[in-house]
């Protein structure tokens, strides 16, 4: 609900408890979300191919080639491949070109991402079977040993989330064993949704994944779109 002439003073939102005055970052988020093309496609000016972590992109392309054997994109150079994915773009009207928000976050070097998104942090903690004097028994956060982009965060954390899940013996067609259960898929989907629906342009936020003995917690900045 919007009342008056100043959106920062007259905007209200409603939750299960009633109406409340929207915060400035919620209002800025609503204004950004008016973009019909979405924010992922936004060109991050002055961020170019040098800001892409080559090893991250190589790993992604390797997975892409395995899953899409014979695809015409497999023969493209890295820049052209990113353009096809929407990770690099040129605005034909202004001539401005560069990595998109999605391209930088997904494949960028940790330094480039931290320079542009110093408000966003990635954190995984295994809090299952902890005691009163131990806060966690495993953690992944930025420590200088890995390029903290979204692709690396996803590929490093996903195996840790699913390694303890039960895998009942089941054969597909009586021949091939199926190790991927509905629970495995649900956990991955929750992780992916956390990444997709995060608002990376907020003032501050943490992509937080917590593994507990009986549940998984996925927390991100922003709301479902």
Regions found by a protein language model. Name each.
Residues 1-8:
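Elongated alpha-helical scaffolds
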Residues 9-202, 209-225:
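Active-site helix-to-loop segments that bind/position phosphate- or nucleotide-bearing substrates
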């Amino acid at each position: 609900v919007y009342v008056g002439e100043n959106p920062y003073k007259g905007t209200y939102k409603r939750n299960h408890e009633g109406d409340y005055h929207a915060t400035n970052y919620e209002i800025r988020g609503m204004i950004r979300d008016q973009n019909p093309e979405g924010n992922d496609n936004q060109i991050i000016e002055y961020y170019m191919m040098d800001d892409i972590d080559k090893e991250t992109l190589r790993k992604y392309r390797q997975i892409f080639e395995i899953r899409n054997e014979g695809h015409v994109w497999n023969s493209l150079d890295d820049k052209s491949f990113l353009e096809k994915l929407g990770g690099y773009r040129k605005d034909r009207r202004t001539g401005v070109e560069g990595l998109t928000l999605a391209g930088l976050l997904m494949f960028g070097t940790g330094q480039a991402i931290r320079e542009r998104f110093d408000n966003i942090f990635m954190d995984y903690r295994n809090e299952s079977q902890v005691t009163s004097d131990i806060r966690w028994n495993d953690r992944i956060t930025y420590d200088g040993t890995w390029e903290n982009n979204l692709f690396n965060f996803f590929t490093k954390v996903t195996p840790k989330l699913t390694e303890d899940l039960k895998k009942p013996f089941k054969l597909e067609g009586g021949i091939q064993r199926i190790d991927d259960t509905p629970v495995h898929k649900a956990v991955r989907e929750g992780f992916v949704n956390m990444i997709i629906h995060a608002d990376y342009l907020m003032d501050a936020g943490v992509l937080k994944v917590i593994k507990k003995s009986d549940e998984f917690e996925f927390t991100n900045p922003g709301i479902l779109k």
